[in-house]
Structures are given as C-alpha cells and as structure tokens.
Swiss-Prot record:
Reactions listed under catalytic activity: (S)-2,3,4,5-tetrahydrodipicolinate + succinyl-CoA + H2O = (S)-2-succinylamino-6-oxoheptanedioate + CoA
A GO CC annotation given for this chain: cytoplasm
Disulfide-bonded cysteines: none
HAMAP family xrefs: DapD
GO biological process terms on file: diaminopimelate biosynthetic process; lysine biosynthetic process via diaminopimelate
Top-tier EC class: transferase
Pathways involved: Amino-acid biosynthesis; L-lysine biosynthesis via DAP pathway; LL-2,6-diaminopimelate from (S)-tetrahydrodipicolinate (succinylase route): step 1/3
Descriptive protein name: 2,3,4,5-tetrahydropyridine-2,6-dicarboxylate N-succinyltransferase
MF terms in GO: 2,3,4,5-tetrahydropyridine-2,6-dicarboxylate N-succinyltransferase activity; nucleotidyltransferase activity
Coiled-coil annotated residue ranges, if any: none
C-alpha cells in the first residue's frame, strides 16, 4: 500500500502535464487499482479511528488523476446514452452480482464506478458520485445526491432531494460525513466537509456548510462545521449586533441519547420545539 501511495503522490505533482495519450502504463494501473479498491470497499477516503475522522488525501488524489488520464467514452444506458470519463458502477453487473451485493437499485438511480454500496442499501432514483461510501442499511431516497468521496454511515436515511456535498476540489478539504443512524430531512444540504454526528436528526430544508452558524438553543453556544451526536437540528436565524436584520443559521433545538433516539419516532422528535 505504501508503494501505491507514493506512486500516486509523485504523479499528482506533475498532473498538469498528463493526458490520456501520455500516461505511463504503471501509473494507469495504479490509479485503476485504487478505484477498484474504492469500488469494493477495501479502501475508503476517510475512516474513523479512535473517535476521530482521518482523511486519506492520497486516495482523493488518485480519483482526481483518473480524470486527467481518461478520455470521455460512450456509455450505454437502458433508455439513453451518455458520454463521460467515469463508467457506471453497474455497467457490467449481472443478476448474480446484484444479489451478491445485497442492495436494491431503483431505476434510474446512477452510481459511478469507484463508489461503494454496502448490503441492505436502497437506492431510489438518486445519484452517488465516485469515491463515496454508503454503509449498510442506508436509504438514499428519490433525487438525493451523494457527492464525491462523501461518507455515509449505517442506517442513515437521506430523504428526497437531499444534497450531500462532494469535495474533490480543493484536494486538502475533508469529505462531508454523515455518521450512523442519522436522518437528513427532505431538501436539506450538508456540504464542505461538515460532519453530522451519529443519531442526529436534521429537519427538512436545513442548509449547513463550513460558514453556517450552528446555534445550540440550550447553551447559547455558536459553532461551525460539526453537528454533535444526538442533535435535533432545524432552520433558524440569529439577529445582527445592531438588531436591524437576521441571518440564517442552523439551530440545535435538543439533544437526545442513543437509547431515546432508538425509541422515538422521527416526527415525534421534531415536535414541541
């Protein structure tokens, strides 16, 4: 693995000169190997170790390099045709491959090669980009999008029209992460490497990026970039210092432990706030 990483790191420094016509065979083989390992779940862009998320920047660099060395090519679909650098994950899947994968794919859901889909995942007509990791038991509902390299935990529900941001550029940015057992309400957007802690509920139409103020109603604290575990979050606003206007924020209206989260329905958590 160290040799693979060093090959990618060295090649990335001279990426500007690369084209599909001058790429070395060894480098192309290395990039393909990384994408295959991402596709199978043997590698992932970010992992949680000792309670902290670590991003493997070299894997993201391999994904970026793949765009430099691949030409657009014809992609045949069931009801249309396409022209892109990245093939469909399921282009060569047989019925047996789908059964072995243990997930459901409802047409016209699209998953790019290099994304991992775990068992018991349900993909409604949605989009999952290259480098993403979607863990067991997750529902990706209609018109939801999972951006490049985003990390989606176990038993997550991404409701209709949800957008989970991708972060291949800039390459030093961390991926957007939705931890286990989270519910993301319809048409919400979580982007720019924000982390949503496990067992959290994000209400409908909440937008969270790195510059979004996250206001804890119980403590009065304002934070950025991370939703604590067990949070129930809704859209809100905070007044300006002079009181002349208000600006958007996300409001943590309550926090619950995992036991309460398991026993309480989603709608009930969002009532009485």
């Amino acid at each position: 693995m160290d040799q693979l990483q060093s090959t990618i790191e060295e090649a990335f420094e001279r990426r500007a000169e690369m084209t599909p016509r001058n790429v070395e065979a060894k480098l192309k083989e290395s990039i393909t190997q990384v994408l295959e390992m991402l596709d199978s779940g043997k590698l992932r862009v970010a992992e949680k170790t000792d309670g902290e998320w670590k991003t493997h920047q070299w894997i993201k660099k391999a994904v970026l390099l793949s765009f430099r060395i691949e030409d657009n090519s014809f992609i045949k679909g069931g009801f249309s045709n396409y022209f892109d650098k990245v093939p469909s994950k399921f282009a060569d899947y047989s019925s047996r491959d789908f059964r072995n994968g243990g997930f459901r794919v409802v047409p016209p859901a699209t998953v790019r090669k290099g994304a991992f889909i775990a068992s018991n995942v349900v993909l409604m007509p949605s989009y999952v980009n290259i480098g993403a990791y979607v863990d067991e038991g997750t529902m990706v509902d209609t018109w939801a999008t999972v951006g490049s390299c985003a990390q989606i935990g176990k038993n997550v529900h991404l409701s209709g029209g949800v957008g989970i941001g991708g972060v291949l550029e800039p390459v030093q940015a961390n991926p957007t992460i939705i931890e286990d057992n989270c519910f993301i309400g319809a048409r919400s957007e979580v982007v720019e490497g924000v982390i949503v802690g496990e067992n959290s509920v994000i209400s409908m139409g909440v937008y969270i990026g790195q510059s979004t103020r996250i206001y804890n109603r119980e403590t009065g604290e304002i934070s950025y970039g991370r939703i604590p575990p067990g949070s129930v979050v809704v859209s809100g606003s905070l007044p300006s210092a002079d009181g002349k206007y208000s600006l958007y924020c996300a409001v943590i209206v309550k926090q619950v432990d995992a036991k309460t989260r398991a026993k309480t329905g989603i709608n009930e958590l969002l009532r009485g706030i």
